[in-house]
Amino acid sequence: MTTGFKEILLINAQKAGFLLSEEIVQKFELYYKELIDWNAKISLTTITEPADAAIKHFLDSILLLHYIPLTGGLIDIGTGAGFPGIPLKIMKPELSVVLVEAVRKKANFLKQIIRLLKLDGIEVYNGRIETLDRHASFDYAVSRAFSEFGMFCRLAEPFIKSGGSLLAMKGSEAKEHTAAHEMTDHGLVCTAIHSYELPMQKGNRSLIIMQKCFT
């Protein structure tokens, strides 16, 4: 099942400008293998084939680094199987990460990955974002598949520092782009919308960046 994953990831990451170290590649491989093993028992993802997983999960996650230099603290809301939070942590070990996942079995998987990969400075919050301590504060909030765009902005905004950013990883839906320009009432300003195509014709993506106004 995992045959070809490493080669596909390495080739396409290099084409995208990422030279992955052997340590990073080993961690991505372990992550993928564990994902496949757990997915046979609990529903984590429908994206399991090597090429699909390499591009749609791992490369898609780290492509975010092309558009914003992540530093400080990141909260990944509705992380599911850990994308993009865990790949970003692997790429940037100095990043402090909180993964928010309401489903207990998925949260247990995330904790296992953190132990397996020996990652420090990353934790799992097993619960809904609405129940997280409002004193928690981050430089970035990211979501790849959480709810609809407006809901993500409303729920994530209280946890972002002034001047911090919300990063919505979406498909190419025009309605999401339009909605991005209508969030000023929530103290957010759209600073950029990046649209791009994944390699191997694996789909189109948009990254919507919303900055929280300074208060």
Language model: regions and residue ranges:
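Flexible, active-site-adjacent loop/turn segments at secondary-structure boundaries
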Residues: 18, 42-45, 51-52, 81, ...
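S-adenosylmethionine
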Residues: 95-98, 102-215
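Conserved SAM-binding loop of SAM-dependent methyltransferases across substrates and taxa
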Residues: 81-94, 154-157
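Short, flexible micro-motifs
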Residues: 46, 81-88, 167, 174
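Conserved beta-strand/loop positions that form the S-adenosyl-L-methionine
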Residues: 77-79
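Class I SAM-dependent transferase core
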Residues: 1-71, 75, 105-122
